[in-house]
Amino acid sequence: MSGCWARRARPWIRWRTSKVSCARCKNAWARRRARRYTRPPPSRRLCTGSRRVWSRCAPSCARSRNA
């Protein structure tokens, strides 16, 4: 099942939902976004500092960026 009912039924919103193709992906993106925004990583401020600080908290930053 490559296409989605939303994309077929409403082709005019395809430019908005080009990255999110189906309802399952939408829910996954929403969950991902909600998790990232409601519970930010505690070491996020450190990651914007020097390279030494970045290397110390790189795993958490990479996790938050990829999630």
Swiss-Prot record:
Superkingdom as given in the UniProt entry: Viruses
Name recorded for this polypeptide: Uncharacterized 7.9 kDa protein in PE 5'region
